[in-house]
Amino acid sequence: MNLKKHLPWLGALLPIANTQAETKPNVVIIYIDDMGIGDIGCYGGKFVPTPNIDKLAQDGLLFNQYYSSAPVSSPSRCGLTTGLFPLEVGINTFLNDKAANKRCEQRNFLDDKLPSMARAFQNAGYSTGHIGKWHMGGGRDVHNAPSIKNYGFDEYISTYESPDPEPAITATKWIWSDKDSVKRWRRTEYFVDKSIEFVKKHKGEPFFLNLWPDDMHTPWVPEFKQKERKSWETQEAFAPVLAEMDKQLGRFIKTLDELGVGENTIIIFTSDNGPAPSFKSVRSAYLRGTKNSLYEGGIRMPFIVRYPKKIKAGQVNNESVLCAVDLYPTLCSVAGIKTEKGYKGDGQNYSKVLLGKSEAKRKTDLMWDFGRNKHFGFPGNPYDRSPHLAIRSGKWKLLVNCLLYTSPSPRDIS
């Protein structure tokens, strides 16, 4: 083959290939830990100004009927990752040590043979990264959890509740320590720094990034309160931590825009579950329920999407009911990529809804399972403690205290 003869043709094709790559949107999922829908200004929150998160809503689309897939960390994260209801993946409360997991009738880690949204993007040629809290397996006495790379991530940095925690933030086996080189009050700053490094490294190619900070989870430790353990769950400590998180997320979004990738980046902002403590339901916007509850305050979350290239700014959707399990098929559709081969998830493709082109009503029901036995962690206030099964169907939500197996033989029905 005469390469000199064909080089002009190859050169002519390169711009086309580059153009096609540039049209693939980047995806960033900002997944806050234990944030209530009433925490931030654009949802009516008044604790402290949250100008950067509010601007994200002003520049994009805010949803008022979005649900997490569970009222607590691990199953919520598994639902978003797999597009499956947590009941199907065998994880129904936060992953703990082996004995506690057994008492709560759950697995020790997310099965890496199950679907993974990141893997679908990786298969499509995206650079993939996870930065922040993991909590889908590993840590404590669970030493056989799969590597985060097994779920489709090229790069990762994670906290102690993971198979390979980052040394800078895990000097001890707890959420933070004075011995950590990155202090508790600088966690989101650190995660944003690492996220910016990831974006700069991959800005010439499509990327998929989880940015999952954990500082909205107690203990809240602003620098000036670092020695006052008794104040780490007070509103006085909460407010500056929220303000700092907003500041750092604003820095990240500004950097995306300065790097010229913001226009073609889908930013999802949401939370894994409801707040704890809720400060007398203020953090849940006065919805009943908190973290560890299937009432609305435990599972109805803030949800904002910014995608300047495709989403008209300043929109609010009050009608469409979305859930974390929908994100896998929906984001794949918006990005123009395929889900994994044989994928059959519980989530639905709501790409038109996500892009602000429709306020379509949900065609399938949602379900949640939490608290099936006495070993689960429940809200301290009995008013917030819910039945352990819930279904949302249309405008109705059913909460039930038991699940019956309907055998053909009536004598088996109890």
Predicted regions and their residues:
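Active-site-proximal N-terminal segment of extracellular/periplasmic enzymes that hydrolyze or transfer
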Residues: 22-61, 134
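Loop/turn elements at helix/coil->beta-strand transitions in domains of secreted/extracellular proteins
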Residues: 24-27, 59-64, 124-129, 154, ...
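Histidine-centered active-site microenvironments of extracellular/periplasmic hydrolases
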Residues: 48, 141-152, 219-222, 231-234, ...
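Formylglycine-dependent
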Residues: 93-126, 134-207, 213-225, 237, ...
